[in-house]
């Protein structure tokens, strides 16, 4: 295939030959179109300018329970500087954007697979190895950095640029069977269970506060924020690992 050939979002190539992160410490993962974190679908047809129906098109991986997050009681284990990120593919790291935090400089960046330039892997909040702060070529499985934030989560977004807009898909849609086997060993039974369908999300629209400076935080349309928070932490949005 030519590197710039179009890609079918419903049937993307399974090119991620390595997991993007150390899976061992993680106990739960959000689904695509979950309402956790903040609205994340900018540049796609699903982006709702009114903030009426919002969703996150990235997977969050958490090593802690929702109770630990609420209480700030993480115990002795800290993911920061311990959990490693890897390149899932042979490709190039581009658009490396630094951001200063209390802990130092963290980075957001894109990895474009060599053979599929319309596909993009987006990484956030990474303590990047020094050799990559200007980008450059990467190989599948290459260690590129660590979790930056204290008790930080893992995050990954995958998008297809069709020349007009972006279409976000799941990391599970592009991983090889060998990589998926790592997740199967932790109780994931199908790739599909990691995505809430567009139709399902539209049938249960969740609003967010666009323009809030935080990327658009989700909130309860009914006003019962406590019940909403509990639902947000539950199985409609998260898949528990074994």
Regions found by a protein language model. Name each.
Residues 160-208:
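Polybasic, proline/glycine-rich intrinsically disordered low-complexity segments
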Residues 53-58, 104-106, 116-118, 151-155, ...:
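Short, solvent-exposed loop/turn segments at the edges of secondary structure
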Residues 106-111, 138-162, 168, 173:
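Short hydrophobic beta/alpha edge segments that flank linear recognition/processing sites
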Residues 21, 126, 170-173, 239:
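Intrinsic-disorder/low-complexity peptide segments enriched for small residues
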Residues 80-82, 86-131, 153-158:
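Zn2+-dependent peptidoglycan hydrolase active-site motif and core
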Residues 101, 133, 166-168:
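Short acidic, gly/pro-rich beta-turn/loop elements at beta-sheet edges
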Residues 3-107, 139-140, 191-242:
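Surface-exposed, glycine-biased beta-strand/turn segments
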Residues 88, 132, 137-138, 144:
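Short, well-ordered loop/turn sites that connect or cap secondary structure elements
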């Amino acid at each position: 295939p030519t590197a710039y050939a179009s890609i079918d979002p419903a049937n993307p190539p399974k090119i991620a030959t390595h997991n993007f992160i150390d899976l061992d410490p993680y106990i739960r993962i959000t689904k695509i179109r979950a309402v956790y974190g903040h609205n994340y679908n900018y540049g796609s047809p699903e982006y709702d300018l009114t903030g009426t129906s919002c969703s996150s098109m990235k997977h969050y991986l958490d090593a802690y329970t929702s109770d630990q997050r609420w209480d700030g009681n993480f115990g002795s284990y800290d993911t920061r500087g311990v959990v490693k990120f890897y390149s899932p593919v042979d490709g190039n790291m581009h658009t490396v954007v630094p951001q200063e935090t209390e802990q130092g400089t963290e980075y957001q960046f894109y990895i474009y697979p060599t053979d599929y330039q319309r596909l993009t892997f987006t990484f956030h909040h990474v303590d990047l190895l020094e050799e990559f702060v200007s980008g450059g070529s990467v190989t599948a499985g290459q260690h590129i950095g660590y979790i930056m934030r204290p008790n930080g989560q893992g995050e990954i977004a995958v998008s297809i640029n069709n020349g007009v807009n972006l279409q976000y898909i799941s990391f599970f849609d592009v991983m090889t069977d060998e990589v998926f086997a790592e997740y199967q060993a932790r109780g994931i039974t199908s790739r599909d269970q990691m995505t809430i369908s567009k139709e399902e999300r539209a049938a249960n629209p969740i609003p967010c506060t666009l323009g809030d400076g935080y990327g658009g935080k989700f909130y309860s349309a009914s006003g019962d924020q406590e019940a909403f928070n509990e639902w947000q932490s539950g199985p409609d949005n998260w898949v528990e690992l074994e």
